[in-house]
């Protein structure tokens, strides 16, 4: 998906990172089991964050094992899975499918069309199971596409619609925590959308693609404007997050929310300001485990 909910590894304890990594690898294994290699390819920071948060909140009974994977055959990784991992895998696969469909719709990316087609077939069993969620998400995406077609530059409006998608993703159960999870997912979705739009605006304008910031990206105060918009939504997300009774994973989840989530934004801001260096996390080898990104800093799918 988007890949902004990543850890700031230098600020983590080793045991916190190992715990996070075990959820990441667990999600990877379930994606492969349920959706094959295509599902495994969709593995994302977003899915790992969702999985880690819900597993802690609902105190799911973990099954812990070790395995080697194709990417790192010489090293065994701890794998942590439970019933919540299944849900996170379902949401990860569905949102990846919608993202690939959007890539094909916007840019005619052949890879997006192929992966979306494969995922469409592999997620058919989820259509009835999550019919209500899918209906809300599909409607929000359709509304976003209509705004794009109109050319209207409305960053808050677009962020609001993507927030509706993520609200559905985080609403795991109809219970006492649903209202907080919905608010959290909604605001996190807005943050992620705005960060992605900020990072991509120059490339989008150059290639003639829609971007909600295209009217303001040349302003001298653009970074401050975008940062302020994002901060408002992130603060509201954090307020909802802190109302959840999280224990085991709360430290690394806070690391992501209060620090890691800003890494790519700060890199993009540094490039635009012409800075020779940017003070950001050195998230180790980008091809290793949950820290792998492509050459542009975007997240890649892959194994644990």
Task: Identify what each model region corresponds to.
Residues 274-282:
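Low-complexity, proline/glycine-enriched hydrophobic segments characteristic of transmembrane helices
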Residues 256-257:
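Short, highly charged C-terminal tails/helix-capping segments
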Residues 1-183, 190, 194-231, 239-249, ...:
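Acidic catalytic motifs of isoprenoid enzymes
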């Amino acid at each position: 998906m988007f890949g902004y909910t990543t850890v700031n590894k230098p600020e983590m304890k080793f045991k916190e990172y190992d715990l996070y990594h075990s959820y990441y690898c667990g999600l990877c294994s379930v994606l492969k089991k349920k959706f094959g290699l295509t599902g495994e390819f969709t593995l994302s920071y977003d899915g790992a964050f969702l999985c880690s948060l819900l597993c802690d909140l609902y105190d799911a009974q973990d099954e812990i094992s070790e395995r080697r994977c194709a990417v790192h055959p010489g090293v065994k990784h701890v794998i942590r899975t439970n019933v919540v991992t299944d849900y996170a895998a379902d949401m990860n696969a569905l949102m990846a499918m919608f993202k690939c469909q959007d890539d094909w719709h916007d840019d005619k990316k052949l890879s997006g069309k192929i992966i979306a087609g494969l995922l469409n077939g592999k997620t058919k069993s989820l259509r009835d199971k999550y019919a209500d969620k899918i209906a809300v998400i599909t409607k929000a995406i359709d509304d976003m596409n209509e705004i794009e077609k109109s050319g209207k530059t409305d960053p808050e409006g677009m962020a609001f619609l993507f927030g509706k998608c993520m609200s559905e993703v985080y609403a795991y159960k109809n219970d006492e925590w649903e209202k907080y999870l919905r608010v959290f997912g909604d605001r996190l979705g807005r943050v992620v959308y705005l960060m992605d739009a900020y990072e991509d605006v120059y490339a989008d304008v150059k290639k003639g693609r829609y971007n909600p910031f295209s009217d303001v990206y040349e302003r001298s105060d653009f970074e401050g404007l975008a940062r302020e918009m994002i901060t408002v939504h992130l603060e509201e997300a954090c307020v909802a997050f802190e109302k959840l009774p999280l224990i085991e994973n709360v430290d690394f989840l806070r690391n992501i929310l209060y620090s890691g989530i800003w890494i790519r934004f700060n890199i993009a801001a540094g490039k635009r300001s012409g800075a020779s260096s940017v003070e950001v996390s050195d998230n180790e080898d980008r091809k290793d485990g949950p820290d792998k990104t492509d050459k542009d800093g975007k997240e890649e799918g892959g194994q644990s």
